[in-house]
């Protein structure tokens, strides 16, 4: 019976449902052994168990697939087992059991030869594949160990890096703390050195400056008698005076009880004795001239006096009189309303513009009249002088506005608030023009029927004097309160002062004008006969020549 190399197809009996049955590996091995050795020559079970122990156990593919699905972590081992089993079946010829096995088993004997050859081939292939499977398992184990070692190495590296980072952080913190401590030490050392230098400078200045006696000019710094400074005796003026102080009580009731706040008055000693020097406020004493320098206590504690023998003595009555005079003479500052304040500012501006110009215009008219000028010439001269004085007035205003750097503002004293400067200027200019035109207009229109020059001058003098006295009284009113005790005296003084000024100005101007007119006529500098000009009044009666000057 010839052996063929092709695979033997063995068919098993089909089930009732028509599905084929897959034979297990152990059953297949038993079947092959029975085909190879025969039914009677099958080796004992012990030998087969040894062979099974040495050989790898067959693995069912369905079980392997289920394990792969259930546990993904054992994929490598399952794949190796599946590869080993597939190699077992792939190297040998596949065996397909297609034959139907009858209950008698007659077909088994006819095909024993071919099955024996297939069994031998399968054993040889399984024996050759066993070491390959073991090698793969070893390799997989080694790979797992290598991976574990790498993971351990990575963990150790990460731990070492973390430790190094922590050490670096700790080192930086320590360095920062050390740096702060060094800076604090440097600052302390610098401050100590500065204090030492300041002390040295202070000691040096103390050595350079010494105290000298104001009486004998001797250096008394090294010979100073230091004494404690004690407070003097104080008396409360609102209460009854002590009986040990001699005070003469007046018959009339005193005003001491009516004082609102009590006044503490210093009662000095009558004489400074050697045993009573500690009671005074002595600071130092000159040993050469016996000069004693002390601070007076009580109401004049800020005054420093140096004396010989005894201090300045004052009685209690003097201090009370001073206090009473202070309370009666001084009045609290009055707050004026805006309307009254604005009216006072207008009066100030009127006085500032008209007072001086009235006196100036009076002098011009009196001097021109004394020189023999006509009425028309006097009026023209007065108006020209008035126009030229406006420039001077503007310059005075500019000086007042620029005088804000001084401690006492002259602008506010003479005119008022700076915010109302435009109104002040307007009122002052109007007053300047009005009071400046009064003397020439009075001279022109007074005694126009008679035309006597002396009468005209008297009328101009009286009109100007009234204007000046009025402006002087306004000046007193805006500078002093009306309810003061000396207001009447102030008005009288102002009237007398400005009357004297008007008289002096008018008299001096008249005298100088008369003298200059006579002197010019004597020199014949402007004589009418020399220049062949006839007078406009030539051949006219005196009664008809009264208004020829106009």
UniProtKB/Swiss-Prot annotation:
Residue stretches of biased makeup (Acidic residues): 143-152
Give the region (Disordered) as residue ranges: 46-199
Name the principal localization, coarsely classed.
endoplasmic reticulum
Its subcellular locations are:
Endoplasmic reticulum membrane
Q: Which residues form a coiled coil?
A: 134-165, 393-418
> Polar residues compositional bias: what residue ranges?
122-132
Q: Disulfide bonds, which pairs?
A: none
Instruction: Give residue spans, biased composition: Basic and acidic residues.
Output: 153-166, 185-198
Q: Give the compositionally biased regions (Low complexity).
A: 80-105, 112-121
The way this protein sits in the membrane is described as: Multi-pass membrane protein
Q: Which GO terms describe its molecular function?
A: iron ion transmembrane transporter activity; manganese ion transmembrane transporter activity
Which terms are listed as keywords in the entry? Answer: Coiled coil, Endoplasmic reticulum, Membrane, Transmembrane, Transmembrane helix
Q: What induces it?
A: Induced by NAI1.
Query: Which is a Gene Ontology cellular component entry for this protein?
Result: ER body
Q: Describe, as the record does, how this protein assembles with itself and its partners.
A: Interacts directly or indirectly with NAI2.
Name the protein family: Belongs to the CCC1 family.
What protein name does the entry list?
Membrane protein of ER body 2
Originating species: Arabidopsis thaliana
